[in-house]
Structures are given as C-alpha cells and as structure tokens.
Amino acid sequence: MVDGDFDFVVQVSNSDDDLDKLLLLVNFVMATARRSLNDLKNIHKRVEEDLAAARRLQEKLSPQMLPTSRHLCASAKCVPARAVGGDFFDFFRYERSGLYSGLIADVSGKGAPAALYAALASGIVGSMVDNELNPQQMLTALNRSLFRRAPDEHFMTLAYFTWDDENLVLEVSNAGLPEPLLYRNGEVQRLRAHGVPLGLFAEAEYESLRIQCERGDTLLFYTDGVVETVDATDKDFGTQRLSNVLLSANGYDSARIVEMVFERVNEHCQCAMNTDDQTVIAMKVV
C-alpha cells in the first residue's frame, strides 16, 4: 500500500481460524478506504469545477473594455491569490452629466466568501450609478447599505472617483485603501484622501478630494496586496518601490504601466506564493 493505493485484496483461506478472520477484516477496511478515497476525489473534482466556474463568472463581471475619453486613458488588472478573490474594479459613465466614474475595492478575507461579498457590493454600486452621486455621496450610501446587509465578519476598503473630461478634474473619496499616487513633472505625490473601511460603522463620514489634473499626469490606484507583497526576507514591496515604478514609466501608456507594476512586484517576491489579491488601475491624462 503506497501513496494511498488501497486497490488490493488479501487472500483468505477457507479455514475458520483467527488469522483468516483478521484478514477478512483487513479486506473490509481496505474496501471501505478505497470507497472513501474515491468519494474524496470526486468531491475535490466538483469543488475544483465549481471554483473554475466561479472564476469565469467573476472575470465576466469585471469590465471587458474600459471607457475611453478624449483626455483619459485607463488600464486595470486584478490578480487573485486564489481561484476567486475579493478585489475588484469597475468603471461607469454618468449619462446626464457626462462624467466618468470608477472604483477599486478590496474585501477582507480571501477566496469564495470574499468573492461573494465583492459581488454583493458591486451589485449595490451598479444599482446606484444612475443617481450620479459624487464620490463622497457614493461611499456614504454604499457604507450604509453594506452595514445593513453584509455579514458582520466582513468589511471592505474602496476608492471611488469621478472624472470630468472637459475640465480635467478628478474627484476621489477613499474608504481605507492605500493612498493613490499622482505622477507629475518627474515627481510622485500621494493623494491624501482618507476614510474608514465600508461596512463597519453605520454613520461613517467620508471626504472628497478634488485634483486639477494636467496633461502628462499619471494616476495610480492599487490595493494593499500590491505594496504588502514580501520577498524571501519578509521585506514588503512598499510604496516607495511603487513610486519608483511610476518614475521609470514616464512616456509609457497606461497598459504598460500596469504591466510594469506587476513585473516589479513579481521580481521582488521572486515567485513566492501570493498571499493576497492584487489590483492596479493606471490612468494617464493626455
């Protein structure tokens, strides 16, 4: 019996001695173990199939094409730590005002429970887009809804922004995500918008930050799984390394910037197991 191989039978004689009874018992145990092993294999196969289906569904829920405007080019990428994850992003267009909006979010926990919470939150946001809320109003409304409807053991960090393509104005509210980065004229600065994670307190308040952008600016939103990725010595990637990616990416389009971020993160961890979902949005003002 090697590596869980129970597919054998012990030969039993026709005598009634104790040894033959023991061998009959061994055969019974082996047959039971064989059935149990096959049952476990079938269960594992069904779980893998369900996770693969959930992963395909989650991929379809993500925007297949990002909105394009005259002055803003956006790219995004999400890499879950497991088959499904709690990070997600989305983009919208406000029909009446003409503003663009978007979000990046990170649900506490990992795997299927986080993915279900993410799907709930994404659906709530989608149902409120027609109201054309500003970022502060969106976070306030979303927080109240999640506080009422979501499980107590989960919460979510999220940044929501609107983009005025005519006036090059970005407005952003942040509920617990790392501070977004702005590259401008050879320097990187943090956008100091703060707020508590969503779903923790019913009456949490959020602030909005308005940025007058300029052509040539690059904006970077990201979840903490990016900067908290560690190398073999347990040193995290960190915001400074992420800022250095932006500094070295001057002249590249948004899609290439996103790829550069993941390339540098992977170089840092040197193929160590990814323990958290990672999501990046890069936007270039043109």
Feature-to-residue mapping (PLM):
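A structural signal for long alpha-helical coiled-coils and helix-turn connectors
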Residues: V2-D5, M30, R34-L37, K41, ...
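PAS-family sensory domains
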Residues: L23-L24, F28-V29, L103-A105, Y222
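… and, occasionally, acidic/histidine-rich disordered N-termini of signaling adaptors
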Residues: D39-L220, Q270-V286
